[in-house]
C-alpha cells in the first residue's frame, strides 16, 4: 500500500505467494505461483484456533463488562433495579472475575470456547482465504485506485500477500470481513449468549439447545440479531486493520534498514509488531459498535422490547402486536445506552478488547504468514531438488 517509505520497500510485498526465488526456473517472470486454497484455509484455521483457546477469557470478561449498566435504572424508567455499583472499571472487572472463579472455577473463564472455536476457526480461515483471493485478483487485474504495480523481483523475506493500494486494502478487508460475519452470524449470537450471565445455563448447555431457544424466542431473525451493528463494527475495523497492518509492515521494515541487513516485510518480528499495532488502533476506532452489538445479542427479549418502545419510532404502534418481534435499531440502542449509562458506556470493555485484538492479531498473522512462507519455501526446495535430479539424469544419459 502507499506509504512514505522508499520504492524498495514498496516492492517488498509480492502477490499472494513467494515464487521469485532465484533458485527456481520461473524467477524471471512476474507471475507468482499461487498457494493452493487448502493451504491458505489450513493456516488460517490454525491461527484462529490458537487465538480462540488462548484468549477466550478476554472475550468472556468483555461480554460480562458490556452487558452491565453503570447506574441502577431500568431501561425505560427511573425505577431502581438491583445491579451492583463499582467505583471503577477495574473494580468491576475484578468483581466479575472473582464471581466467575468462585461459581465455576477457573475453567469458567473459558465458558463459550466451543462456539468461539466453531465460529472463529472456519471464520478466520474463510477470512484469510477471502482477503488473500480478493487481493490476488485485484493485484493481477490492475484495477485503478486499488492495485499497484508488481515488481519482477523481490526478496525471499517479503510478505506472501499481494500488494494493493490503501484503498484496495480498505475495500478487500471490509468486504471479506462482513461477508464472513454474515455467514457465521448464527454462531456469533450463540457465542454471546454463552458468555453472558443474562441467560440460564440450563437453556444454553449446548449449541443446539441454544439455537432452539433463539428460534423459539425470536424466530429465524434471531440468528442475525445485532448483525447491523456487527457490520458497522467489522467493515471499518477490517478495512482499517488491513490498511494499517500493511502500512506498519512497510514502515517497520524501512526502519530496520539501520540494522545489519534489515528486516523484510515477511520477517516474524515485523509481522507480529504490525499485527499488534494495527489491531490496537483499529479496535480503538470501532469499539462503540462492539458495545451495541453485545447489548443487542445479550439483552433478554422482553428488555429489548421495552428499549425499542422507548427509543424507536415503532413504539407508536400497538405493543400487543409487536410484543414478540419488536427489537431496537442500532440508533435506538445507542440512545438507550446514552440515557441509562452516559457516554462512558461506549468505552466498556475497551481495554480487554484492545488486549484481545492486539494479541489475536499478532498470533493470527504470525502463524498465517509464517505458515504460508514455510509452504512456499518447501515448494521452492522441492522444485530445486527435482530440477537437480533431472539435470543429473540428463548428464548420466549423455555419458
Curated annotation (Swiss-Prot):
Molecular function GO terms recorded: glycine transmembrane transporter activity
Annotated spans, Disordered: 379-399
GO cellular component: mitochondrial inner membrane; mitochondrion
Keyword Transmembrane helix: yes
Key words of the record: Membrane, Mitochondrion, Mitochondrion inner membrane, Repeat, Transmembrane, Transmembrane helix, Transport
Main location: mitochondrion
Membrane topology value: Multi-pass membrane protein
Gene Ontology BP annotations: glycine import into mitochondrion
A Pfam family it matches: Mito_carr
Solcar repeat placement: 35-137, 164-251, 266-374
UniProt superkingdom: Eukaryota
Catalytic reaction equation(s): glycine(in) = glycine(out)
Record has Acyltransferase as a keyword: no
Coiled-coil intervals: none
Transmembrane region(s): 41-66, 112-138, 170-195, 226-249, 270-296, 349-367
Subcellular location: Mitochondrion inner membrane
Function description: Mitochondrial glycine transporter that imports glycine into the mitochondrial matrix. Plays an important role in providing glycine for the first enzymatic step in heme biosynthesis, the condensation of glycine with succinyl-CoA to produce 5-aminolevulinate (ALA) in the mitochondrial matrix.
Family affiliation: Belongs to the mitochondrial carrier (TC 2.A.29) family. SLC25A38 subfamily.
UniProt protein name: Mitochondrial glycine transporter
Species for this entry: Mycosarcoma maydis
